[in-house]
C-alpha cells in the first residue's frame, strides 16, 4: 500500500518519484532487480517523472564495477520509459550519483552525508554529464565506486510534494 501511495503522490502535477539506494547486485544491502521492478511498476502506474539516485557500492562487489551496473540501469530505464501506458509521457533520469561512503555513512559524519544530501535534494553540485560518463570521469580521477564524489546529473532536485522510496533492504 505504501508504494502505491508513493506512486499516487508522484502522479500529482509537478511532482516526481525519487528512487534511491545502492546500485549493486552484491545482495547485502540492495538488489538491482528490486530497483528495476520499482521502475517498471511506477511506469505501469503512470508516474510521469521518475528520478533515480544511485549510491555506488565498491565494497560488496569489485571496486570499479559500477560503470557496468550504471550501463545496465541506463538500458533498463530506456526500455521502461518506452512502455508507458497509452503513450503517456514518462521521463526517467539518473538524477544523482554518489559513493556509499557519502550516502550510507554509519558513523554520524555529517560532512559526508551533507554532500550526498546536497546532490540528492538540492541538485548541487550539478554536472551536465551522462551517468556512465560520470562514472568514467570518477575512474579517470582514480576514485572508485565507494568513494564517487556526490554529483547531481538532473538539475531539478527534490521538491515539496515529491515522493521518495528508499530501496535498500538492510536497515543500516
Protein language model features and the residues they cover:
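…; additionally, a secondary subgroup of soluble metalloenzymes is captured
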Residues: 1-172
